């Protein structure tokens, strides 16, 4: 299982985007990531750090819009993302 809160949030983000099939040009608003998290885990600073780490690892692609940041999974890293989810989820 993931150890830190940031790792748990990363897993939540990847799993949510994976379940919604948000690869490449299918986008997901960053404001909707908090849905599905327990109230004590909805700290926007931790979520921002997790998103920044995933973008830095190139697992997430970001698109700035006038109403917020849109995210999608990078299809080039599909195998790595699937392995990470399987390893940490089960």
Outline where the language-model segments fall.
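Short alpha-helical segments that sit at the start of domains
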Residues: 1-25
């Amino acid at each position: 299982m993931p150890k830190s809160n940031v790792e748990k949030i990363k897993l939540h983000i990847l799993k949510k985007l994976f379940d919604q099939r948000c690869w490449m040009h299918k986008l997901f608003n960053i404001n909707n990531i908090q849905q599905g998290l327990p109230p004590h885990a909805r700290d926007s600073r931790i979520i921002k750090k997790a998103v920044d780490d995933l973008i830095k690892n190139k697992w997430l692609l970001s698109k700035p819009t006038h109403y917020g940041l849109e995210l999608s999974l990078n299809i080039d890293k599909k195998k790595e993302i699937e392995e990470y989810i399987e390893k940490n989820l089960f």
